[in-house]
Amino acid sequence: MQLVGSGNQAKRHPLFTADGSVTTGGTPQLILPETPSRSFLMLQNVSAGPLWFEFGSARATAALTNGAISSITVTNAGFNFSKPPVVRFAGGGYSGNTAFLGLNQPGGDGPNSSIVAGRVARAHCVMTGSAPNLSISSIVIDDHGAGYAIAPYVFIMNSDLDPYGCAVPSATSGMLLSAASAPYLLNGTSCFTDAIAVFGATTGQAFLCRWMT
């Protein structure tokens, strides 16, 4: 995608539409699956009641004991999966200095063997339900890892074979757009490509969704 008005915008860049309404009140609903590219996104609530939107895959947190992951708690089981999503651990290492408290975010160093014997943990998802509406029932630790300074960030991402799984939106989870509020816009240097889902309490609540690749 080239910037509008630039000399390199020499082909069509259409705006795609995924407008809709809540099919069944009180039930999460997928709006868009994960996409290879997305340069613009607009979401707007045009109904008379609040709507909640969620982005990306399921979510979980890790607990640490003596430098190793001791347990993983699923905080958002996700929905609409046909394949188990992938679990990755980000950050949590000493970053070459045992005085460092660790950074439990993507981009933070993981444990390694440079100053203490360390290795990154491994885990996999156990699913419940039937495809295409699987959700995560638990996460099994295959390798507890070693040498963590702080519990790492648990990053759950959809399988390459399944772009349709998404975090569950609800009245207590997700981005709230109030009735007839201003649109949520992403336009410029970055726009996520994650799956997007919506939740509304009442059947028929309408929303707008427009995007560009």
Give the residues covered by each predicted segment:
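Short proline/glycine-enriched turn/loop motifs at strand-loop junctions of beta-rich domains
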Residues: 35-38, 45-50, 79-82, 148-149, ...
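Glycine-centered tight-turn and secondary-structure capping sites
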Residues: 25, 80, 147, 178-184
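Short, flexible beta-strand-to-coil junctions
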Residues: 43-50, 55-56, 157-161, 198-203, ...
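Conserved, function-critical positions that sit in or immediately flank catalytic
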Residues: 57-173
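C-terminal interaction-tip segments
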Residues: 1-28, 199-213
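Beta-rich globular "head" domains
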Residues: 19, 25-56, 210
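Noncatalytic modules at the cell exterior or secretory-pathway interfaces
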Residues: 39-41, 188-205
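Beta-sandwich interaction modules
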Residues: 30-33, 172-193
